[in-house]
């Protein structure tokens, strides 16, 4: 794709916050990031994290991390730990202690009782299917539940018995009494509490009734003094309900909800259900597989926090739905690593080269810059009689325009001498296993006299180079819209069978032998790579390809 503009795109919420502060509405702003701990954060969450934490930073406010933990059956401490780690990795720190919606269960219960006493909530015995029938449709109004007119006393008694664990899961629910004829489906007597006999990771077995997201969210914002409650556009229709609860309860503050468009990235799936399916069915190695759209996956792939933050700044914040080209994200990491990643050489498909006219036993220590522009110092490569080049850099019958090594032809070894291919040694099956070459001793750092050498290839010394594993990652899906499957198919049909190639026996220059996990490099002529967070260790490195040097997919 063409190079995107790197300047920040418009952010309408920044203007709203500035206007509120200028008008003296708030002494300081307080935002929050409220994930449900039922999965790992993905690239879409990064936009929300950067927005909420970024606004708080920019305007000297606070940003809370609050886990919306109202569904214990799907939540786990593993996800809580991973979410906290991802936020810190992105470069943000929440204000104060971590918050949990479950911290407010006692207060939420007390407010539910107040709604019952005010005649604004009732206990309903309809099951899920019946409730769906009574609810109506977008074009037809709903019908009142036959239990809507229960007395306050009966509702208080039933709700207390629900809390005491007297009824099985799903037998009853507590619903708000709003308007079954409302064109907004969310106002048709929404559920406030469900019976769910499930152990909770924070509150244990104290509760067997749990509040709904809608009943929890706005009141939690009010308790925490959130000034700007920012969520994605799918919650726009929930805002009237958010405001109804705040208007009908004695909450300590009146937060305001704002919506922005979620991040939709092509070639990508961000549905937690689908990501979990990829993991559970073994299509990927785990939530942090480098092909996943999770932040832990991008981290293991070699993406930097700076590149993701810059990407989120580039795409901006607005209310228009659209699809962002994944090429913008790939541009962002290329741009950052081009400026920061030290250069190194790694031969992915080694072919041995013997330089026949180089003195046996002689070794020259050649100094090559770690970076062409930045002052990162030098690394030392021992140059001797035997070395490795990539098998793809020699062709006996070259295609048109081939500028690498051919029989009788010359190339320059990066940072070293010009060599000529004199003889190809083959095994019994006709495979080339070794090249015999000669070098021009007068070409170190300069062109040979009277002839032009166009090609430059990378190499590593045979002695001192490090054997390593290289994992060539690519996009997990071959379709720009993975969700779009043929009739009877699924998004799994769009998985890219070539999204991972594992190469064993690669040879890396000596300086890479002591690479620590998450050390990043540009492998010259190959791409940007990172030492794997889990599997790589000094002396036995494993490198993951973060991204190719150039966009090999083009406009998707």
UniProtKB/Swiss-Prot annotation:
Q: Kindly state the positions of the motif 'KMSKS' region in this protein.
A: 269-273
Q: Which GO terms describe its biological process?
A: glutaminyl-tRNA aminoacylation; glutamyl-tRNA aminoacylation
Q: Which PROSITE patterns match?
A: AA_TRNA_LIGASE_I
Which positions in this protein are listed as binding ATP?
36-38, 42-48, 232, 262-263
Q: What is an example of a GO molecular function annotated in this UniProt entry? A: glutamine-tRNA ligase activity
Gene Ontology, cellular component aspect: cytosol
Places the protein is found: Cytoplasm
Tell me which InterPro entries the record gives: aa-tRNA-synth_I_CS, Gln-tRNA-synth, Gln/Glu-tRNA_Ligase, Gln_tRNA_ligase_bac, Glu/Gln-tRNA-synth, Glu/Gln-tRNA-synth_Ib_cat-dom, Glu/Gln-tRNA-synth_Ib_codon-bd, Glu_tRNA_lig_a-bdl
**Taxonomically, which superkingdom?**
Bacteria
Q: What is its main location?
A: cytoplasm
Summarize where L-glutamine binds, as residue positions. Answer: 68, 213
Annotated family = Belongs to the class-I aminoacyl-tRNA synthetase family.
Subunit (UniProt): Monomer.
Query: What is this protein called in UniProt?
Result: Glutamine--tRNA ligase
Organism whose genome encodes this protein? Pseudomonas aeruginosa (strain ATCC 15692 / DSM 22644 / CIP 104116 / JCM 14847 / LMG 12228 / 1C / PRS 101 / PAO1)
């Amino acid at each position: 794709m063409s190079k995107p503009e790197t300047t920040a795109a418009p952010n309408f919420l920044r203007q709203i916050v500035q206007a509120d502060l200028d008008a003296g509405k708030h002494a300081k702003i307080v935002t929050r990031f409220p994930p449900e701990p039922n999965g790992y954060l993905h690239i879409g969450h990064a936009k929300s994290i950067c927005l909420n934490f970024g606004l708080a930073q920019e305007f000297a406010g606070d940003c809370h991390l609050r886990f919306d933990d109202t569904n214990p059956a799907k939540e786990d401490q593993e996800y809580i730990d991973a979410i906290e780690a991802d936020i810190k990795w992105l470069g943000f720190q929440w204000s104060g202690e971590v918050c949990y919606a479950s911290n407010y269960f006692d207060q939420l219960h007390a407010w539910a009782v107040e709604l019952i006493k005010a005649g604004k909530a009732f206990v309903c015995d309809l099951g899920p299917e019946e409730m769906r029938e009574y609810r109506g449709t977008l074009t037809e109004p709903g019908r009142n539940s036959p239990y809507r007119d229960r007395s306050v006393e009966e509702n208080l008694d039933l709700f207390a018995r629900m809390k005491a664990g007297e009824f099985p899961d799903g037998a009853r629910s507590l619903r708000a009494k709003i308007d079954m004829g409302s064109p907004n489906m969310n106002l048709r007597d929404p559920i406030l509490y469900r019976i769910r006999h499930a152990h909770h990771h924070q509150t244990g077995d104290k509760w067997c009734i749990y509040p709904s997201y809608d009943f929890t969210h706005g009141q939690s914002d009010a308790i925490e003094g959130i000034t700007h409650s920012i969520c994605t556009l799918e919650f726009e229709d929930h805002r009237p309900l958010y405001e109804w609860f705040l208007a009908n309860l004695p909450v300590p503050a009146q937060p305001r909800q704002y919506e922005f468009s979620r991040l939709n990235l092509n070639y990508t799936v961000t549905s937690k259900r689908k990501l979990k399916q990829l993991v559970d069915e073994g299509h990927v190695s785990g939530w942090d597989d480098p092909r996943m759209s999770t932040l832990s996956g991008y981290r293991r792939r070699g993406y930097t926090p700076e590149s993701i933050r810059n990407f989120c700044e580039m795409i901006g914040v607005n209310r228009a739905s659209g699809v962002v080209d994944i090429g913008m994200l790939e541009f962002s990491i290329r741009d950052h690593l081009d400026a920061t990643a030290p250069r190194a050489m790694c031969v992915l498909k080694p072919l041995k080269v013997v330089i026949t006219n180089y003195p046996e036993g002689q070794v020259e220590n050649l100094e090559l810059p770690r970076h062409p522009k930045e002052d990162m110092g030098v690394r030392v490569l021992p140059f001797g009689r035997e070395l490795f080049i990539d098998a793809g850099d020699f062709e006996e019958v070259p295609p048109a325009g081939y500028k690498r090594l051919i029989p009788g032809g010359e190339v320059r070894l990066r940072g070293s001498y010009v060599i000529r291919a004199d003889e190809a040694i083959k095994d019994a099956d006709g495979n080339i296993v070794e090249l015999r070459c000669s070098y021009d001793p007068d070409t170190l750092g300069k062109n040979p006299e009277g002839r032009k050498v166009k090609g430059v290839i990378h190499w590593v010394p045979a002695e001192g180079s490090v054997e390593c594993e290289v994992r060539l990652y690519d996009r997990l899906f071959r379709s720009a819209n993975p969700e779009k499957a043929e009739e009877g198919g699924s998004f799994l049909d769009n998985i890219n069978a070539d999204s991972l190639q594992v190469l064993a026996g690669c040879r890396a220059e000596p300086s890479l032998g002591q690479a620590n996990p998450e050390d990043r490099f540009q492998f010259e002529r190959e791409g940007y790579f990172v030492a794997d967070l889990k599997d790589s260790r000094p002396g036995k490195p494993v490198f993951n390809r973060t991204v190719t040097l150039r966009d090999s997919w083009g406009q998707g």
